[in-house]
């Protein structure tokens, strides 16, 4: 995790050309099935009965709370049917919400240039920032398939990195892209050129540790169709719309934590929802440590368990309010506040770590 080669992550399956797809259409993608490597209960590869959650170090990608957690950590999760448990985060078990973190169509040449121009301009405002503000094209590590060799340098210098979500879909990390979901992607090039990857066994809203879902290898079974001229007909000029599947865990009891747009040292910010979600997560972490978890164990849990994150208020100046809903039924003990005080767990071996370089 400390030295994870981020230049080569997100190797995608595809692109798949869809016959008849043209710019302006909507590409319908049905997720018929998705899961870990089938009929594999154990093995050396993630997805063979296990997966992992990582906290990237601040100097190698970082995460949502990288200032509070600058080092690298991981948790290994074991799969039993739909359930995940971990020797590194004891006392919890939860039903996975299996989904692809990344899926989308190809951009047009003009849209690709727009991405590179705007992200390059952002990087230029603070080029030495750690972690960086954005990730520019990296020709040396671009996977260019059948592109003629004499064009590799040009194409590699323009090829978009797959880390962020963009107008084409991309790395949205929406945990609700489950089996049974139907997604409507805008089409920008002939054939649509659909790609996908980054399968997750489970994830909390926000994927807050960056490598925050339970990462795994696996399979996905898709069906595609088209709505001709659908981008104009339905006003979907950019970014996908989707209908979630109906296979999510049915948790009914929650403990919610809130945060506002005030920094840890008390500075007031204006309607900063990013900050308010950070504060809500930190409040949840502080709470879980009272039961015996280390802060890192709690952070890993929030990234991997099916927590719900919400923008609860975005208009009441100067503070936005974000909330994190933690399903209480995933714990082997009563995690709710009571007069008897917090139950003390045995934190076990803890989360393996490596110090930030």
Predicted regions and their residues:
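Short alpha-helix capping/helix-loop boundary micro-motifs
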Residues: 10-16, 167-172, 285-287
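Short, well-ordered loop/turn sites that connect or cap secondary structure elements
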Residues: 18-21, 177
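A generic structural signal for residues embedded in beta-strands
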Residues: 26-29, 185
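Intrinsically disordered, low-complexity linker/loop segments enriched in Gly/Pro
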Residues: 33-178, 184
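Short, Lys/Arg- and Gly-enriched loop/turn segments at beta-strand edges
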Residues: 34-49, 191-201, 311-314
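Conserved mixed alpha/beta catalytic, RNA-binding, or beta-rich assembly cores of soluble enzyme
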Residues: 123-125, 129-271
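Extended, compositionally biased non-globular segments
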Residues: 246-303, 307-310
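TerminUS-proximal long segments
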Residues: 285-357
